[in-house]
């Protein structure tokens, strides 16, 4: 585990304005995640964990409080700077894969590099490298709608890594997968964390999926009610 914080949140508060008035979603949240950690975030529906992940991903902003990502105070950045920081530091993995159905895997994986203006030949090389890393060597020309769900999620992980991201935010990444495939995907996350030092923050409602992480953060009613290491029993999968 690294000692350098990649995520630091202090006194984070988030509320949404509705016709009935302000609705607080996150209340006085404090959290530091260091480089190389593997953290599971859990909580019941409506606990604030999804809003928290959106803020971590620079897809939403807090009402008040501080969020420092990779040494940058996100509250001091404009929208363009925030987008640039997000694209440089974070790789996203979602439950629904979010691959372009009419594009092959190589082009899907290279997409974040296209947004950054990387030359097509360079992007293609990096995409093939990442596909090989996630166990999809030789699949670059395969169409995303012609492969299995597990292979699609592997491709999505390759896309999250292609920017040399230091941090992966994974939102229910096994939600659409069967038990065996879920285990394969979580073993891949474990390998990326152990061998490459990738920081992983994972939202899940499944205890067996959370048990692959080394640290558990639990939300209830917009507050962190538990933050600690997994027990030895829970670590059995890792």
Positions of the model-derived regions?
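ABC family nucleotide-binding domain
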Residues: 4-219
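ABC-family P-loop ATPase nucleotide-binding domain
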Residues: 1-15, 226-238
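H-loop (His-switch) and adjacent beta-strand-loop-beta switch element
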Residues: 216-229
């Amino acid at each position: 585990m690294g000692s350098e914080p990649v995520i630091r949140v202090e006194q984070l508060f988030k509320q949404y304005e509705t016709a009935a008035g302000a609705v607080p979603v996150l209340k006085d949240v404090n959290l530091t995640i260091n480089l190389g950690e593997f953290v599971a975030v859990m909580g019941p529906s409506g606990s604030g964990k999804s809003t928290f992940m959106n803020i971590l991903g620079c897809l939403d902003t807090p009402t008040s409080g501080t969020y420092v990502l990779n040494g940058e105070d996100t509250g001091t950045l404009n929208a363009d700077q925030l987008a640039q920081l997000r694209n440089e530091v974070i790789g996203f993995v979602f439950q629904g894969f979010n691959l372009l159905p009419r594009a092959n895997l190589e082009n899907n994986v290279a997409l974040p590099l296209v947004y950054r203006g990387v030359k097509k030949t360079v992007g293609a090389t990096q995409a093939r490298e990442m596909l090989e890393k996630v166990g999809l060597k030789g699949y670059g020309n395969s169409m995303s709608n012609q492969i299995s769900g597990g292979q699609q999620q592997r491709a999505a992980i390759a896309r999250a890594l292609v920017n040399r991201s230091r941090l992966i935010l994974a939102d229910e990444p096994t939600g659409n997968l069967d038990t065996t495939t879920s285990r394969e995907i979580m073993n891949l996350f474990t390998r990326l964390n152990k061998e490459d030092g990738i920081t992983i923050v994972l939202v899940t409602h499944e205890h067996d999926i959370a048990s692959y992480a080394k640290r558990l953060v639990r939300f209830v009613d917009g507050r962190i009610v538990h933050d600690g290491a997994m027990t030895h029993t829970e670590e059995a999968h890792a």
